A protein has these predicted regions:
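A short, N-terminal "cap"/entry segment at the start of jelly-roll beta-barrel domains
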Residues: 1-87, 216-222
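Double-stranded beta-helix
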Residues: 2, 128-148, 174-230
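His/acidic/aromatic-lined binding-pocket segments of jelly-roll/cupin-type domains
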Residues: 89-91, 109-113, 120, 154-155, ...
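Conserved metal-binding segment of the jelly-roll/cupin
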Residues: 94, 151-178, 184-189
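Glycine- and acidic-residue-biased ligand/ion/polar-headgroup-sensing regions
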Residues: 94-95, 107-109, 113-129, 134
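A short beta-loop-beta micro-motif enriched in histidine and acidic residues
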Residues: 78-87, 98-110, 114-115
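Short helix/loop capping segments that flank catalytic or ligand/cofactor-binding pockets
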Residues: 101, 122, 173-174, 195
Length: 230
């Protein structure tokens, strides 16, 4: 991805959040210079990779396949004494923008619709070899209510509602085409994106960044560079 795409995506996300009166922690609005001035009391934020994330999953077409997220809370599997025993994200999707098919080996998550556009979620079971099973039915829970699904079924999630994704359940979600920008969220067990994503095809969570313009916002993957030029 280009840094210019990331800057614009976060600017757009902040506008969408402001429009729906969704507030984030103060450091969500910091500049790189603000981060340079941050003291050691902020080290838990950087260690646990809280803050902004933005990816096109290596597909090179962010407007179609991508997401902008802010990790509000998370724990640390290597340091169980700190952080929280759960994760929370706020995400923003443009109309028609989607994530690629993927599952998690360990994480259970509620995907929640909050404001704006309509959240759409598609589900498939996984085969024992971790490929997608395109024939078998299954079941999930929406706000605690059991729902059966056929392979590839799409659920439309109204505002205030959620769908629970369990391990090894292939899913992708998006903001319904022709609608508004979607503000959604995720509440989950501790999130470990570096090791707990299994994507279909050639998609990947972390992608190289082309620094075509200065950073306006730091991503959580930028934190190791805080003592370098940002």
């Amino acid at each position: 991805m280009k840094r210019s795409e990331i800057n614009t995506a976060i600017d757009n996300a902040l506008r969408a959040l402001e429009r729906h009166d969704v507030k984030l922690p103060a450091y969500a609005y910091w500049t790189p210079d603000d981060w340079k001035r941050a003291g050691p009391e902020y080290s838990r934020i950087t260690r646990n990779a809280l803050g902004w994330a933005c990816t096109d999953f290596g597909q090179g077409k962010f407007r179609e396949i991508g997401i902008t997220m802010f990790d509000v809370r998370n724990g640390n599997v290597d340091r169980p004494e700190e952080g929280t025993p759960y994760g929370e994200k706020i995400f923003v999707l443009q109309p028609g923008q989607r994530l690629p098919y993927h599952f998690h080996w360990k994480k259970t998550e509620d995907i929640i619709s909050y404001h704006g556009g309509t959240l759409m979620i598609q589900l498939f079971n996984a085969n024992p070899d971790e490929t997608m099973n395109e024939t078998t039915p299954g079941h999930v829970y929406c706000d605690g209510v059991r729902r059966e699904f056929t392979a590839g079924q799409v659920f439309e999630i109204p505002h205030g509602s959620s769908l629970t994704i369990t391990p090894k359940l292939y899913h992708r979600f998006w903001a319904k085409e022709g609608g508004d920008v979607l503000v959604g969220g995720e509440i989950s067990t501790i999130s470990v994106p570096k090791t707990d994503n299994r994507f279909g095809g050639n998609a990947r969570r972390f992608v190289p960044i082309e620094e075509d313009e200065p950073k306006r916002h730091l991503l959580n993957i930028d934190y190791p560079q805080l003592h370098e030029t940002v």
